Amino acid sequence: MLTEDDFDDLCRRLYLSLRDGSVNREAAFDLSADRLAENPADEAAAEVAELAVAEDADPALLAAAARELLSSLHFRPTFDDEPGWLVALEAALKVVKADLRACGLPDAVRLYTWEGSPNAAVDAWAANSTGGGIYPEAGKDPVTALVEVAEDTQDAVMHSVWGAWPQCPKHNVGVHAREHDGMAVWWCGPGGHVVARVGQWPRRHT
C-alpha cells in the first residue's frame, strides 16, 4: 500500500500529464494497482491498469479512464497545479472591486492563500472572510470564479463595516451572489430578482 504522500504524488503526476495532453502510464498503472490492492472490484482502476500496459491502447480512451479514476479518488488540483485558476480569481476580484466603489466603500481588498489550506480567501481593510475560502477549481470557470469571489468579498466587507453589503435598494435587505442565466449576479432573495450583475452595481444603490 502506498503512503499518503506517495499516493498524492501519483495522483498529481497523472493529473499534470493529463493537463498537458498526455498520460503518464507509469503513474496511471501504479495508482490503479494500489487501488486494486485495496479493492479488487474497483472497475475504474481495473480499466486504467489494463489500458496503461496495452501498447495499442487508444490514447483518448486511456486519458478518459485516467480522468475517471482521479475523479473517483476525489483528487482536487491545487493552485500549484493550476496557477491560472488563481489568476482567474484575481481577475474576478478586480470586477467585484467596482461594486465596492459604486457603494462608496474602499476597494482595499486582496486575495490571499495560507499554509494548511488549498483555498484562497479575501481580506478586506478591517477583516478577513470567515468561511473556508474559495476552492481552487472555482477558477476553472469565469462565472463560478466571479460568484465565489463575490461571496467571499461580501463576507470580509460585512465584517469590516458591521452591516449588510450590498443591499437591495427596493427591499432594503442584503443580497447574495449567485449564477443566474449564465451570469454572476447579486440576487435579492426576498424579492426573488436580480439587482445587478456582479461588477455592475449602480452607483445610486448603496
Residue ranges and their predicted role:
Residues 2-144:
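Long, charged N-terminal interaction/targeting segments
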